[in-house]
């Protein structure tokens, strides 16, 4: 993340195509070290691409990802107390535990595809 943040800072500073040295100097200015492998990967993936278009494409992809917020079942409303009313039985639900797959970690898409 810090490599991406440094890259974006360079772009915001007016450098439309930051180099590895540009990103490294930004990271070193705050006492952070650059991971060479991640830096080279980032630079190769963003080579000849407009960062605003990359961000727009990312937003579009994220808009298609479900973010939870599903309906919540609150159950039936409580019955008015009556003399002969039997207590409502509670239905027990079993929760299935699903194993998390590797592809679930990136929510089904790569940052640079």
From Swiss-Prot:
One of its GO terms (molecular function) is protein-containing complex binding. The keyword Zinc does not apply. Phosphorylated. One of its GO terms (cellular component) is cytosolic large ribosomal subunit. Keywords: Phosphoprotein, Ribonucleoprotein, Ribosomal protein. Residues 66-113 are annotated as: Disordered. It holds the Pfam family Ribosomal_60s. One of its GO terms (biological process) is cytoplasmic translational elongation. Residues 89-99 have a biased composition (Basic and acidic residues). The keyword Acetylation does not apply. P1 and P2 exist as dimers at the large ribosomal subunit. PANTHER family: 60S ACIDIC RIBOSOMAL PROTEIN FAMILY MEMBER, LARGE RIBOSOMAL SUBUNIT PROTEIN P2. Plays an important role in the elongation step of protein synthesis. Belongs to the eukaryotic ribosomal protein P1/P2 family. This is Large ribosomal subunit protein P2B.
